[in-house]
Amino acid sequence: MNQERVFKVLLGPHVSEKATVLADKKGQFVFKVATDATKLEIKKAVESLFSVQVERVTTLNVLGKSKRTARGLGKRNDWKKAVISLQPGQDLDFSSSAE
């Protein structure tokens, strides 16, 4: 996988209360990913970017909410979320990967 595709697959970490609990208790990390990304692409991107061994990748599609605007109803974009499970003894460090 080329370096350009790695940065297009992983859009960034998803920070929420549930994602923080998963990271603290189970060592799982949540990322926003491209909607066309596959589990294998996500696994390779995380392994190459953070130099860790990924055990499992779980993905889910999040549907955008309908919101009212001044001009009527609008809809937020759909997006894809990936939960990354690392092998035992592995940990992600977001600060050291920004080289």
Curated annotation (Swiss-Prot):
Any one cellular-component term (Gene Ontology): ribosome
Pfam families reported for this sequence: Ribosomal_L23 (PF00276)
A molecular function GO annotation: rRNA binding
Biological process terms in GO annotation: translation
UniProt KW keywords: Ribonucleoprotein, Ribosomal protein, RNA-binding, rRNA-binding
Keyword flag rRNA-binding: yes
InterPro entries from the UniProt entry: Nucleotide-bd_a/b_plait_sf, Ribosomal_uL23-like, Ribosomal_uL23/eL15/eS24_sf
Keyword Ribosomal protein: yes
Quaternary structure and partners: Part of the 50S ribosomal subunit. Contacts protein L29, and trigger factor when it is bound to the ribosome.
Purpose of the protein: One of the early assembly proteins it binds 23S rRNA. One of the proteins that surrounds the polypeptide exit tunnel on the outside of the ribosome. Forms the main docking site for trigger factor binding to the ribosome.
Family: Belongs to the universal ribosomal protein uL23 family.
Name listed for the protein in its UniProt record: Large ribosomal subunit protein uL23
Lineage, opening ranks: Bacteria, Pseudomonadati, Pseudomonadota, Gammaproteobacteria, Pseudomonadales
Gene designation: rplW
